[in-house]
């Protein structure tokens, strides 16, 4: 299967492939709501497409140590999964990310589309979610 065909096969109904790493990882899950406007939601989707996302934003995410970041959407609700090495410190990484090129500009623009106040950093807008069930521990 070619990479293009794999992507074509990934849907909410068929599931999404997950990368594995040679190091232990931990996961952060967060949520945020978009403004209830079809036009703004379409713009948010467009800005996060591979063709539109700013390369400086992707570079910054990698630079602070994040291995993977996925954002899922249902209506106006966003759900983000972040995977990072077990020694990753969220607060330190987010403080550093906020100083990297174009990050503040990106956050300002995204805040127009999100239910968030202008000037808020990514770490301030996205709310951490508590894991309430874990199959491996049952």
How would you describe each model-predicted region?
Residues 40-65:
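Short amphipathic alpha-helical segments
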Residues 25-43:
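Short glycine-/aliphatic-rich beta-strand segments at the starts of folded cytosolic domains
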Residues 10-25:
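Acidic, low-complexity proline/glycine-rich segments
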Residues 1-9:
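N-terminal amphipathic/basic-hydrophobic helices that include classical n-h-c signal peptides
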Residues 64, 85-125:
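An amphipathic, aromatic/His-enriched active-site/gating alpha helix that lines ligand/cofactor pockets
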Residues 127-133:
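Eukaryote-biased recognition of C-terminal alpha-helical segments
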Residues 28-33, 67-100:
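Short, well-ordered beta-strand segments in beta-rich or mixed alpha/beta enzyme
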């Amino acid at each position: 299967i070619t990479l293009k065909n794999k992507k074509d096969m990934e849907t909410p109904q068929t599931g999404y492939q997950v990368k594995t790493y040679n190091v232990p990882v931990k996961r952060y899950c967060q949520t945020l709501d978009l403004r209830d406007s079809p036009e703004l939601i379409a713009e948010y989707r467009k800005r996060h497409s591979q063709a539109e996302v700013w390369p400086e934003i992707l570079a910054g995410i990698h630079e602070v140590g994040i291995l993977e970041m996925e954002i899922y959407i249902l209506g106006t609700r966003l759900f983000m999964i972040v995977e990072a090495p077990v020694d990753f410190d969220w607060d330190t990484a987010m403080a550093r990310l906020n100083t990297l090129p174009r990050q503040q500009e990106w956050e300002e623009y995204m805040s127009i589309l999100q239910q968030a106040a202008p000037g808020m950093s990514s770490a301030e807008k996205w709310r951490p979610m508590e894991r309430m069930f874990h199959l491996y521990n049952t």
